[in-house]
């Protein structure tokens, strides 16, 4: 089982793949989950808009789209991340780009672990889970 990192039409972000993979596995383990096949696809705003329209019938830009292929406690999915939106968000929230990128990377994993962020009170739960995961990365 593996975590892969790919790009579509853009330069690969400067992330430490081995460390990031180990961090993702550690976060998943806190939810009693194992990694199956996870593919991160880093892309542009235009690509994520295309994916959003084609597969979700949403006509807007977003930072991440997670396609869930999980089976039991094994996490599998395709996670599209717009690096342009991540950069915009880091500026808007006045956070370092690297931190915002890792927040987005783990956000998709947390969705695969069953954490939602659309209903009442769910955004706060997701944000707390993201902060806990980011703290694990810094240790």
Curated annotation (Swiss-Prot):
Zn(2+) binds at residues 107, 111, 117. It is found in: Cytoplasm. GO terms for biological process: rRNA processing. Disulfide bonds: none annotated. Its EC number is 3.1.-.-. Keywords: Cytoplasm, Endonuclease, Hydrolase, Metal-binding, Nuclease, Ribosome biogenesis, rRNA processing, Zinc. GO terms for molecular function: metalloendopeptidase activity; RNA endonuclease activity; zinc ion binding. One of its GO terms (cellular component) is cytoplasm. Transmembrane segments: none annotated. Its cofactor is Zn(2+). Single strand-specific metallo-endoribonuclease involved in late-stage 70S ribosome quality control and in maturation of the 3' terminus of the 16S rRNA. Belongs to the endoribonuclease YbeY family. This is Endoribonuclease YbeY. The gene is ybeY.
